[in-house]
C-alpha cells in the first residue's frame, strides 16, 4: 500500500509518522509532501530516511492509496482534486470539508461506516475537542438519547501547532530571565500563567468558530439533534486538552450505569476515584491514545443531568490517531482501491 502524508513537517505530520510505525500500518511505499519551506527536509520512518517533496499540481498521487493531509484548510481545498483524482482516499485533518454534505465526518468509535460513502474521495477528520467529546458521549447515547450538552474546554498550546508550543515555552523563559513576556504572536495575549477565553475568531452568534465546530460537528458525527453550547479556552499547558462536559438525557441515568458503559467503551479509559485523588489530568494523557474520563456525577441542577471530566492528547486521538484509525477501518473492510 502506498501512503502519502501532506504536511509531514508539522506537529500532526510528525505524529503520523510515529503512529504509523507504532501500529505497524501496512505500508509498502511512503511519500512525504510539504510546502516550499519544508521541501527537502528529511525524516526517518522505520529506519529509512525520506525526503519531503514539494506539493504540486502534478501526477505524484497517481499510485497513492491513502493520503493523510494536515497542511491547513487552504492547502486541502487547493489540492483535494489533485490528491484524489486517481482514486486515493484523502483523510483530511483541516476544517475545510467537515460540514460539506458529500464529505463524511468520522470518528471510528462512533460512525465508522460513514467513511464508506465518500463521493469526492475525501473523509474529514473532526475538530480535536469534538473527537474527544463524542468518543465519551457515544456510550452514554446508547443508554439514553442526549438532548443537550454544555462543555467548557481547556485547550493546551499544542492545539495551535508546534510553533505555539515553542512560544509558550519561550514566554516562560522570558518571564524567568527578564520578568516580562516579549514574544506574543500565536495567541492574542500572553498565555504563560494565563488563560484566554477565545480560540479562533468570533462569529455573529457571539460564539467562536471553535465553539461552533463543537455544535455542528457533534450533530453530524452522532446523527443527532443534540444542541451543544461550548466555551473554548486556551490554557498554559503544553499538550493534551481537557473538557468539563454536562449533558441532559431523555431518560434518567444513574452514575453507576454511566460508569459501567464508559468502562467498556472503545477508546475510553475510566479513571474515576476522586476520593483517592484519581481522575484524568492532561499531564498523564499526553502521548496516550485513549480519551480519559472521570469525575462522573449526577448534575444537581437538572433531573436527567450527568456531568463528567475528560482529557486526551489532541495531537494523537484529536488528530493523527483518529485519521489512522479511519484508514485502518477502510483496510479492514476492504474499502481501499
Give the label of every model feature segment.
Residues 1-191, 227, 291-292, 296-302, ...:
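N-terminal Rossmann-like NAD(P) cofactor-binding subdomain of oxidoreductases
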Residues 67, 157-337:
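Charged docking surfaces used in two-component/phosphorelay signaling
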Amino acid at each position: 500500500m502506498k501512503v502519502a502524508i501532506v504536511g509531514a513537517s508539522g506537529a500532526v505530520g510528525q505524529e503520523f509518522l510515529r503512529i504509523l510505525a507504532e501500529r505497524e500500518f501496512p505500508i509498502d511505499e511512503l511519500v512525504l509532501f510539504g510546502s516550499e519551506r519544508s521541501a527537502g527536509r528529511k525524516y526517518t520512518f522505520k529506519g529509512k530516511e525520506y525526503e519531503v517533496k514539494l506539493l504540486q499540481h502534478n501526477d505524484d498521487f497517481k499510485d497513492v492509496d491513502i493520503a493523510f493531509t494536515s497542511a491547513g484548510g487552504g492547502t486541502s481545498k487547493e489540492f483535494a482534486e489533485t490528491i484524489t483524482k486517481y482514486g486515493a482516499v484523502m483523510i483530511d485533518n483541516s476544517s475545510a470539508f467537515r460540514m460539506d454534505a458529500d464529505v463524511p465526518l468520522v470518528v471510528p468509535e462512533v460512525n465508522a461506516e460513514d467513511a464508506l460513502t465518500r463521493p469526492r474521495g475525501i473523509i474529514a477528520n473532526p475538530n480535536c475537542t469534538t473527537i474527544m467529546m463524542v468518543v465519551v458521549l457515544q456510550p452514554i447515547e446508547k443508554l439514553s438519547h442526549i438532548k443537550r450538552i454544555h462543555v467548557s474546554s481547556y485547550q493546551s498550546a499544542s492545539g495551535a501547532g508546534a510553533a505555539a508550543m515553542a512560544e509558550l515555552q519561550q514566554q516562560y523563559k522570558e518571564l524567568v530571565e527578564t520578568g516580562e513576556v516579549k514574544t506574543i504572536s500565536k495567541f492574542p495575549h500572553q498565555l504563560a500563567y494565563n488563560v484566554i477565553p477565545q480560540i479562533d475568531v468570533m462569529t455573529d452568534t457571539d460564539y467562536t468558530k471553535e465553539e461552533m465546530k463543537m455544535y455542528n460537528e457533534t450533530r453530524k458525527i452522532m446523527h443527532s439533534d443534540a444542541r451543544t453550547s461550548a466555551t473554548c479556552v486556551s490554557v498554559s499547558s503544553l499538550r493534551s486538552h481537557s473538557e468539563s462536559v454536562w449533558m441532559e438525557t431523555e431518560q434518567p441515568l444513574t452514575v453507576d450505569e454511566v460508569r459501567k458503559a464508559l468502562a467498556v467503551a472503545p477508546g475510553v479509559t475510566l479513571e474515576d476515584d476522586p476520593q483517592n485523588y484519581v481522575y484524568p489530568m492532561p499531564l498523564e494523557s499526553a502521548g496516550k491514545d485513549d480519551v480519559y474520563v472521570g469525575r462522573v456525577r449526577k448534575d444537581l441542577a437538572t433531573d436527567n443531568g450527568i456531568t463528567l471530566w475528560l482529557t486526551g492528547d489532541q495531537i494523537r486521538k484529536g488528530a493523527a490517531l483518529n485519521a489512522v484509525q479511519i484508514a485502518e477501518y477502510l483496510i479492514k473492510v476492504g474499502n481501499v482501491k
